[in-house]
Amino acid sequence: LITFTLCLGACSEDDLDSKSIFDTEEPKMNEFDNWLMKNYVTPYNISFNYRYDDKESNMEFNLIPADYDKSIALAKMMKYVWIDVYKEVAGDEFVKMYCPRVMQLFGSPAYYPNTGSIVMGTAEGGIKVTLYNVNVIDIEHPYIDIDSPFPDKSGSTTDLNYWFFQTMHHEFTHILQQKKNYDTDFNLISAGNYRATDWINLKDPDAPKSGFVSGYASKEANEDFAEILSVYITRTEAAWQKLLAAGVVGEDESGKQAILDKLEIIREYLKGSWQIDIDELRKVVTRRSAEVATLDLTTLN
């Protein structure tokens, strides 16, 4: 009774503020937002989300926002070496029809706490692609390695092919897979060599001996498919030949042959299902990747 009386005494009749304590207003459009509207939203219905949003993140990861200026640089590069590539090779309608509707950026890399493995990007339901580690971008000296058969995966690498563009082609391959199935004979070629959870222990330079272009490709068939396609089109022919050579052990060329057999199925899939010549796609990707150094990434011109 005493406590109840004290509580009553402590109450007052202050007027309630009609304004919510939660910020429900949409952020005002800035110069970058206007550029995105013109280059992503209006022509392709792509929402390029560079602002941090908890609802768009995987709470298993400890993530930070993407830097504003580096998000601008990535948006310009992504348009040049991904959107405009498919526009040039497959046509504007292809991009409008099959591109993801949401691209979400985060500034830091995403690590699984239990395994220590890193997530380069994710594709969800053919609609959304998430890219991590945007803050690694060196705006003044953008570096896209198309000449090495195996990427530098050291923590300090600034290779944008490794972090973003091969990843984007990989994730887009998953979107295409979800739209149209590929020949299931692909799944049989390396059926006995997939490593499920143990793929993380297979180093990239050793992977070709077992018929894979990377350690991650050995996880399962869908990832194998996406890895072969994305590695092939983001590397020069010289780099690809070096990768194939790593699949030869003495007189044993079974690793190399497995990669080539799977590549042939991918080649037929792209041509038959999407009317895309994989070698023309590679030619445009590598050409545009080499031209990125000439882009002005500091302005929104």
Each PLM stretch: what is its role?
Residues 6-10:
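C-terminal motif of bacterial Sec signal peptides marking the signal peptidase cleavage site
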Residues 12-97, 252, 258-301:
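Acidic/polar, low-complexity intrinsically disordered N-terminal segments immediately downstream
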Residues 60-68, 139, 150-163, 211-219:
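Second-shell loop/turn segments in exported
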Residues 72-136:
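Auxiliary, metal-adjacent structural segments of Zn-dependent hydrolase domains
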Residues 79, 83, 87, 173-181, ...:
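Sec-exported extracytoplasmic/periplasmic mature domains
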Residues 145-183, 226:
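Active-site recognition of the HExxH zinc-binding catalytic motif
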Residues 165-207:
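Acidic, glycine-rich loop-and-strand cores that form catalytic or ligand-binding grooves
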Residues 194-281, 286-301:
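Metalloprotease/metallohydrolase-associated module, dominated by Zn2+-dependent proteases
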